Amino acid sequence: KSVLGAVNLVNTKISKKLIGANIHDQTRIDTILINLDGTRQKTSLGANAILAVSMAAKKLSAKIKRVSLYKTFLVKNNYRLPYPLMNIINGGAHANNGLRIQEFMIRPDKAKSFSEAMRICFVVIDNLRKLIIKKGLSTSVGDEGGFAPMISSNEKALDLVVAAINKSGFKNGKDVSICLDVAANEL
């Protein structure tokens, strides 16, 4: 739909259906718009009209409430940082060490806070560093900040990560989980 056609639809067909709708009920407004269009691909009213009206309603609701627009998207107030996936061994395109998996990461499942999550990760990383040194390997880092030792296989890298988790006093898969970025597009 053209922009002028969208404006015409808003001023005629859409506005009539929205009169009396609660401006603070975004779900209801969007449902009215979707039902009014009636097509799966929104081809009757068109995205120019539907999106513009939906966004305008959301902005008006924020203005009436006297809050920043982004605050109208918040569902609850108990904010918390997500737990990190810590990159601890690099391979693939991020390191010149022969490993095919690009990133071996850990996720601190046991943590009850972000600071505890970071502490758990640092303990595992420190123990991984000690294990790498004990094996006579380099603790140089790859492009993404994980260690990039010359290890002969992905399995041996995983064994090292599991050993570091265990040495740190954690249980693999319970307290700390292993995550992989296999970068399949690079295989």
Model-derived features with residue positions:
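Metal- or metallocofactor-binding catalytic centers and their adjacent structured scaffolds
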Residues: 1-63, 67, 118
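Flexible, glycine/charged-enriched surface loops at secondary-structure junctions
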Residues: 23-29, 47, 69-72, 129-147, ...
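Flexible, glycine/proline-enriched loop segments at strand-loop-helix junctions
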Residues: 40-48, 104-119, 145-152
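Conserved phosphate/anionic-ligand binding catalytic regions in large, soluble enzymes, centered on
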Residues: 41-62, 83-99, 143-147, 182
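Glycine/threonine-rich beta-strand-loop-alpha-helix active-site module
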Residues: 66-85
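Mobile "lid/hinge" segments at catalytic clefts and subdomain interfaces of large enzymes
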Residues: 79-142
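Catalytic core of soluble alpha/beta enzymes
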Residues: 155-187
